[in-house]
């Protein structure tokens, strides 16, 4: 199964341009207006590996299959996405399917390219996205905790899992990402954690989109 990486960021920061560059394709429309991308663009890219190349030279197999990465170009996120603003739930659902997040951040000035918040501020943009991911995790965890509490009556293991979910919810409410939560050994909680697909538990790679003079 290929590793899936979701390309995310605010509208008009260069996500689709990066997607086209990574996949050597022009499948994703890149335009100077918000929500140019609505449905996610997807492409599978083979991963170069010199070790495989060396083995191919030695063995001369009939067929060579490299590891692959699935890149997914996801619609732009805006402040309030966790409450349904912009493409809201659709955007967050698309991210949930990815194993890792590639966050594109605009770091260049250009009066001809609009910024959804009116000015270029990379740190503010990162905070906006990570806040929305955290709020979405809080919502999902809160709902799951409520269900687990109802199911825990008379079931010791379920009660332990519900208590652990409460600890996770407190952790998130304190502004901490799920990736820093230290869970106790509890199979029922581990299963619930996996089903939640917490956004702040995913690895994040930051991509700074700079002007040519900064390269």
Per-range role (PLM):
Residues 1-112, 141-143, 147:
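Conserved G1/Walker A P-loop phosphate-binding module
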Residues 2-8, 13, 19, 147-215:
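C-terminal-of-GTPase-core extension/linker across diverse P-loop GTPases
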Residues 43-48, 75-85, 96-158, 171-185, ...:
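Conserved Switch II/interswitch segment of TRAFAC-class P-loop GTPases
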